[in-house]
Regions:
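A short, surface-exposed alpha-helical micro-motif characterized by mixed small hydrophobic
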Residues: 196-198
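ABC ATPase "signature
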Residues: 214-215
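Conserved ABC ATPase signature
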Residues: 130-134
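Conserved ABC ATPase "signature" region
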Residues: 97, 101, 108-126
């Protein structure tokens, strides 16, 4: 489980995130929406211990984000879209094994995990190809496999499907559903409202660093008198924000 209580981040005079509070349960996919600059990525980076909050608190699996950052990090899988962040000179297998070893897995355990994840993501035939020779879709699958190789309880996804073709996007969506069924806690930040509607149990909308809406799709539509998520989003976040 993951919980935020008035989590805040200021960059000098800029209030990037302002007293954001919400919680995400095990087996839940939580969608985090907002226009560019709304504070989505800053929020995820704080949860991933990549940024230190200015104020407020957060806990992951009962661990305090500020007091136990190293322990918190071991419970998190993180994937940012756009750049898979692979080591181009290493093969797909080596990329996964290397990260697994960094997370404390034995060589044998890391090797088995690489094989099983390659099967799950359907890139077994590319396991021994250098990462630089692989397509964007395959690279993103490998990056996703790498970020869950240590079996984290909490997954943070920031635009994980950006630039992927329809088939690769479907593969990633299906695997996110599988992770949910396994009881993982997932936050998904994505500009694609259709993906958010399909995958997310609840949705939070950020606007200028503040959480302006929180609830299920039906709750958001009923509360705001809207017919769908797109209408809710533009009503609360502003059509000129995108």
């Amino acid at each position: 489980m993951l919980a935020l209580n008035k989590l805040t981040k200021h960059f000098k005079a800029v209030k990037a995130v302002q007293e954001v509070s919400f919680s995400v349960d095990k087996g839940e996919i939580f969608g985090l929406l907002g226009a560019n600059g709304a504070g989505k990525t800053t929020t995820l980076r704080m949860l991933a211990t990549m940024l230190t909050p200015t104020g407020g608190t957060a806990s992951i699996e009962g661990l305090d984000l500020l007091k136990d950052p190293d322990k918190v990090r071991s419970h998190i899988g993180l994937l940012f879209g756009g750049d898979a962040g692979l080591y181009d000179r290493l093969t797909a297998r080596e990329n996964i094994i290397y990260f697994a070893r960094l997370c404390g897995k034995s060589g044998e355990e890391a090797g088995k995990r690489a094989e099983s994840l390659a099967q799950a993501f359907a890139f077994t035939e590319y396991l021994d190809f250098p990462a630089k020779k692989l397509s964007k879709g395959t690279r993103q699958k490998i990056a996703l496999a790498r970020c869950i190789v240590h079996d984290p309880a909490v997954m943070l996804f920031d635009e994980p499907m950006v630039g992927l073709d329809v088939t690769s996007r479907k593969d990633v969506e299906d695997f996110m559903v599988l992770l949910k069924e396994q009881g993982k806690t997932i936050i998904l930040s994505d500009h694609n409202l259709n993906i958010t509607e399909r995958l997310c149990d609840r949705i939070g909308i950020l606007h200028k660093g503040e959480l302006v809406a929180l609830g299920t799709l039906n709750e958001l539509c009923e509360t705001n008198g809207c017919k769908d998520l797109e209408e809710v989003f533009f009503k609360l976040a502003g059509r000129d924000s995108e």
